[in-house]
Regions:
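Mg2+-dependent prenyl diphosphate-binding active-site environment of isoprenoid biosynthetic enzymes
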Residues: 1-168, 175-185
Length: 186
């Protein structure tokens, strides 16, 4: 469908997210404006937009590992963190539980992005279901291009372990999140 339709689809999904957040029922800990605020902070200038700007500015230029982590923290990781935090807030999570969900989302989001970078250089387009090597073609910084494939795999494994560890306070009651991590990370 092309880039234009993809941008419009993203816009539609974002506005739908705000619509749903606005319709969410308050809990005794979280009010409707908490849900909308969480989404707005994630989609706004300090998170998603900042990460995308850094990503676009880095194309075709040398990017440090710290800059790449910044991009991933403000894009993929921020979106996944927001998703699990909103779920926790809707379930009336305690502050401790919400912090565990925040940690999980952060680590699973970073791990997902590192794994995506690895797959982009190790699998074919047919295996990926999308164009392989696209990042390299536009000289986009990735973990394999900065630290190599072996180190990227180690980083992904460490982040994955941290994501699973973040769920320990739930003592087996986070089966759906564990399944999400299994799906995203394997």
């Amino acid at each position: 469908y092309g880039e234009g339709i993809a941008v419009l689809a993203g816009d539609a999904l974002l506005t739908l997210a705000f619509e749903l957040a606005n319709q969410a029922r308050a809990t005794n800990r979280y009010k409707q404006n908490d849900f909308v605020g969480e989404l707005a902070r994630t989609a706004g200038h300090a998170q998603l937009i900042a990460g995308q700007v850094a990503d676009l500015e880095g194309e075709g230029k040398p990017v440090s590992r710290a800059q790449l982590r910044y991009i991933h923290e403000h894009k993929t990781s921020a979106l996944l963190t927001c998703s699990v935090r909103l779920g926790g807030m809707l379930a009336n999570a305690t502050p401790r539980q919400l912090q565990a969900l925040t940690d999980f989302g952060h680590h699973v989001g970073l791990a997902f992005q590192v794994i995506d970078d690895i797959l982009d250089v190790t699998l074919s387009s047919e295996q990926l279901g999308k164009t392989a090597g696209k990042d390299a073609a536009v000289q986009k910084a990735t973990y394999p291009s900065i630290v190599g494939l072996a180190k990227s795999r180690k980083i992904a494994a460490d982040l994955t372990a941290m994501a699973y560890a973040a769920l320990k306070p739930f003592k087996g009651q986070a089966v759906v999140l564990e399944a999400l991590a299994d799906y995203l990370l394997k």
